[in-house]
Amino acid sequence: MSSRLGAVPATSGPTTFKQQRSTRIVGAKNSRTQCSIKDNSFQYTIPHDDSLSGSSSASSCEPVSDFPASFRKSTYWMKMRRIKPAATSHVEGSGGVSAKGKRKPRQEEDEDYREFPQKKHKLYGRKQRPKTQPNPKSQARRIRKEPPVYAAGSLEEQWYLEIVDKGSVSCPTCQAVGRKTIEGLKKHMENCKQEMFTCHHCGKQLRSLAGMKYHVMANHNSLPILKAGDEIDEPSERERLRTVLKRLGKLRCMRESCSSSFTSIMGYLYHVRKCGKGAAELEKMTLKCHHCGKPYRSKAGLAYHLRSEHGPISFFPESGQPECLKEMNLESKSGGRVQRRSAKIAVYHLQELASAELAKEWPKRKVLQDLVPDDRKLKYTRPGLPTFSQEVLHKWKTDIKKYHRIQCPNQGCEAVYSSVSGLKAHLGSCTLGNFVAGKYKCLLCQKEFVSESGVKYHINSVHAEDWFVVNPTTTKSFEKLMKIKQRQQEEEKRRQQHRSRRSLRRRQQPGIELPETELSLRVGKDQRRNNEELVVSASCKEPEQEPVPAQFQKVKPPKTNHKRGRK
């Protein structure tokens, strides 16, 4: 004992404790020394080693008598250093090793954990986990299935290799059905060639007529419907394509090298005509303008070119129209959407106006868009509107933001509006204010309206056929015509005023002249009466004649044979 650990001096106090500590570290390094504590005092136990000592009677070293018996360590300090307090147990027989310094087994630790769960958690750093029972299902799922084994060179092995390579295997009987598993393929082969319906395009077998129709519609939609004489029935074909598009949502090109799909019938048909064709064939299919020879790929492009560059296409009669335009008209009537009754009536009126009047008077560069009337061509007068200062407008806008409404500023008017534009329109027709703007007046029937939208609606609904004046004396511009009409009305008013003044003067002339003989007075009165009758008859006949412009008209006084002052 003294040869391995060294002699411990028989001194008391702190020096003895340091020596004991150093010897304990040396024993830990050799990993053959175990430390045990008995009655809160240190005791060293050295395992039996035959190579070092020949005696077998020394199973444990003697206790150190010099270590003070009163020196004790706390239980918490010993537990922090994983030093278990020694228990009263007898040392085993010769050659046995004392188990006092060994770690407790798992069962004893669990018992200590039940007594001190928090300290156990702090000392050993073990977390409390709930006891879980193993799930038999999860264990069963984890079992990996072994790949099926088939005989070498059998059909099952060939099918399995094809499924691994391509993902599916086709039926060897019909070559139209594919399956992803060998079991599914065998199940199909039991009923193969027993279905009632077979596709005559690809040979696929189906169990029901509805399934066959859907298969043909979805996979063979490019095949046209033929008549008795092998002619394509366009209405039936369009109806079939419309049904396919409604159910599937798209039409796909059936060429193997093309994967295009379309959401409209026109786009699909346009693609089918040109898909897979060479440049020479596409060049033959182009449409050329008969005026300038410019080529176009579509009829819509050619129609736009003719409208914008070579005048309106509707001015041509049916016999004089080019073949391309006739085809366009027939296509728009036969296929596509059905026109409404109002649209047909409008087209009829436009064509009638264009063919009858506009082709004669308008320039050749006019287009069909000029047939649509705009504000300048509307036959109504606009009244003047009052002007407002910026301060007033700013005040109105502020009131709208605060109170969300504006009241009419005129006294006695309780009109309320939620916008500045509405208040402006109201002030133009409000009779309680200083400004009276007037009303909108239709020049065709002299009817008055409060708002501009009202007079526009009136003209569009009542005078729909009177957009353009159909009169041989009309000019090319509607504005010039309106100016001439205004001038004629002013001249007519001037004539009436002039006639009324002349009649008043003639009536006042006998009172101003000097008294004459009775004979001369009678003759003068008779002549005046005759002259007045002539003037009245002439005034009655004048409105029946066409009005003559003022610049070509000369006012001539009526000729009379009576001379003043002559007997």
UniProtKB/Swiss-Prot annotation:
Q: Name one GO cellular component term.
A: nucleus
Superkingdom classification of source: Eukaryota
User: Could you tell me where this protein is found in the cell?
Assistant: Nucleus
Gene3D superfamilies in alphabetical order: Classic Zinc Finger (3.30.160.60)
In what ranges is there compositional bias, type Basic residues?
119-130, 495-508, 556-567
Q: Is the keyword Nucleus assigned to this protein?
A: yes
Q: Which gene encodes it?
A: ZNF512
Identify this protein by name. Answer: Zinc finger protein 512
Q: Which UniProt keywords apply?
A: DNA-binding, Isopeptide bond, Metal-binding, Nucleus, Repeat, Transcription, Transcription regulation, Ubl conjugation, Zinc, Zinc-finger
What does the UniProt function comment say about this protein? Answer: May be involved in transcriptional regulation.
Residue ranges for the region (Disordered) are: 1-32, 86-148, 486-567
Q: Tell me any Pfam family this protein matches.
A: ZNF512_C2HC
Question: Compositional bias (Basic and acidic residues) spans?
Answer: 523-532
The signal peptide annotation in the UniProt record is: none
What's the family? Belongs to the krueppel C2H2-type zinc-finger protein family.
* Zinc finger regions, C2H2-type: 197-220, 287-310, 406-430, 440-463
The Swiss-Prot or TrEMBL record annotates one GO molecular function as:
zinc ion binding
Please name every pair of cysteines joined by a disulfide bond in this record: none
Compositionally biased tracts (Polar residues): 12-23
The residues joined by the cross-link Glycyl lysine isopeptide (Lys-Gly) (interchain with G-Cter in SUMO2) are K18, K84, K227, K333
